Each structure stands twice: as structure tokens, then as C-alpha cells.
Swiss-Prot record:
The lineage of its organism: Eukaryota, Viridiplantae, Streptophyta, Embryophyta, Tracheophyta. GO terms for cellular component: membrane. Residues 27-93, 150-205 form the PQ-loop domain. It comes from Arabidopsis thaliana. Disulfide bonds: none annotated. The chain crosses the membrane at residues 25-45, 62-82, 88-108, 123-143, 174-194, 202-222. It is found in: Membrane. This is Mannose-P-dolichol utilization defect 1 protein homolog 2. Belongs to the MPDU1 (TC 2.A.43.3) family. Required for normal utilization of mannose-dolichol phosphate (Dol-P-Man) in the synthesis of N-linked and O-linked oligosaccharides and GPI anchors.
């Protein structure tokens, strides 16, 4: 008995017999359900960050390079899934995250006026290359290499922001809710990857996500306290 690719027969059979499903039956089911929950949650994961920027009309403390690299990483991941003909449940999360990441970068550019001419080279280059990558019209070997590099891209997408936070002793307009959801999502992906026996490279990527998102989340908690104290003192 399958629902959305989830085999429910094992769990339903156990419950009909008045028994609680065994671990080997329950864990894969939980893994699949969590995977679909992540796809649903990805629709809103970056909205708190976008809303915070628009509300405050400020991008103080945000590293534009970090968010640009996120766009590149999501584009490569989505293109690879489309190229392999995977079902929407496998790449839907990346599609929603890419759309939100593009809106987020656009907001950063808008509230960073005037944007240097050299900065515009990066989005123009992306617009020129992204359609070709998403259409899968590149050398297969290069495609595999790009996909293999995505974990490094996501790692380097976080490092500039972590360093900027440390240097400024402030997280500026970073959204706690967005990075909390990123952190929680990475933990869930580690669990689902272990259950589905994903390749070690994929598991490593999600583990790095736990570390980097956890680092930024910790910085938000640490550096927001002095800022709140200063604001209270000023009042």
C-alpha cells in the first residue's frame, strides 16, 4: 500500500494486529514523511529573512557573496535533479529554495544602493550561464563535477557570513527563524540520508550544513544579547 511513494503496508499491518510497528518498519516511514515535510517547509524557509530586510529596509551585516553562492549551489542541485529525471519530491525543495534565494539576493542589491558596477558582473554572468546549466546542455563530465562541487559551494557560502559576524561581533539583519529552519532541515536530512543509505558525499554535505548553520545560529544568539542591552540602555 503506497501513498506518494511511501510504503504504508508494514505499519498498517502491524497496527491491525494490535502491535506497534518494528524499528525496521517505522524508521524508513518516518524518514519518508520527514522528507515530504522538508519540501513543504522549504516554501517558507527564507521568507523570514526576506521580510526582515524589507521591513527594516536594511541589509546591515549581510554578506552578499554568501547569498550569491547559495543561488549557485541551489541552481546546480536543481539542474542535476532535472537532468537525471528525478520526481518532484526529490527536487521540489531545491526549486522553492532557489526562487527564494533569488528574491533574497535581489533584495540585498536593492537595499545596498548604489551597487558597484563590478558587482553587477556576477548576476549578469549567472543569467547568461544558468539557463544552459538548468537545461542540462553541458558536458556530462562537467555536470558531474559541478554537482560534486556543490557541497564545497554551500560551505563557502556560509564561511563569509560566519567571518563577517565574528569580525563585527554582530549578526545585523540575519533572521534567527530562517537559520533555525536551515539548521533543523540539515539535521533531518542527515537522518533521512542515513535511513536511505545515501552516498557518503551527500551525507557529508548535510553534516557540513548542520555545522555551518549551527555556527551562524549560535552567533545570532550570542551577538544579539549585547545589541539588545545597548538598545535598552539607550532608551
Amino acid at each position: 500500500m503506497d501513498y506518494l511513494g511511501i510504503d504504508m503496508s508494514c505499519a498498517i499491518g502491524s497496527l491491525r494486529n494490535g502491535d506497534f510497528p518494528e524499528k525496521d518498519c517505522l524508521l524508513p516511514l518516518i524518514s519518508k514523511l520527514l522528507g515530504y515535510c522538508l519540501v513543504a517547509a522549504s516554501i517558507t524557509v527564507k521568507l523570514p529573512q526576506i521580510m526582515k530586510i524589507v521591513q527594516h529596509k536594511s541589509v546591515r551585516g549581510l554578506s552578499v557573496v554568501a547569498f550569491e553562492l547559495e543561488v549557485v549551489g541551489y541552481t546546480i542541485s536543481l539542474a542535476y535533479c532535472l537532468h537525471k529525471g528525478l520526481p518532484f519530491s526529490a527536487f521540489g525543495e531545491m526549486a522553492f529554495l532557489l526562487i527564494q534565494a533569488l528574491i533574497l539576493v535581489a533584495c540585498i542589491y536593492y537595499y545596498s544602493q548604489p551597487v558597484p558596477v563590478t558587482t553587477w558582473i556576477r548576476p549578469l554572468l549567472y543569467c547568461a550561464v544558468a539557463p544552459t546549466v538548468l537545461a542540462g546542455q553541458i558536458n556530462p563530465t562537467l555536470f558531474e563535477a559541478l554537482y560534486a562541487s556543490q557541497h564545497a559551494i554551500f560551505l563557502f557560502a556560509r564561511l563569509p557570513q560566519i567571518w563577517k559576524n565574528f569580525k563585527n561581533k554582530s549578526t545585523g539583519e540575519l533572521s534567527f527563524l530562517t537559520f533555525f529552519m536551515n539548521f533543523a532541515g540539515s539535521i533531518v536530512r542527515v537522518f533521512t540520508s542515513l535511513q536511505e543509505k545515501a552516498p557518503i558525499s551527500i551525507l557529508t554535505g548535510f553534516a557540513l550544513g548542520v555545522v555551518t548553520n549551527g555556527s551562524i545560529l549560535t552567533q545570532i544568539l550570542l551577538y544579539s544579547k549585547p545589541a539588545a542591552a545597548k538598545e535598552k540602555k539607550a532608551n
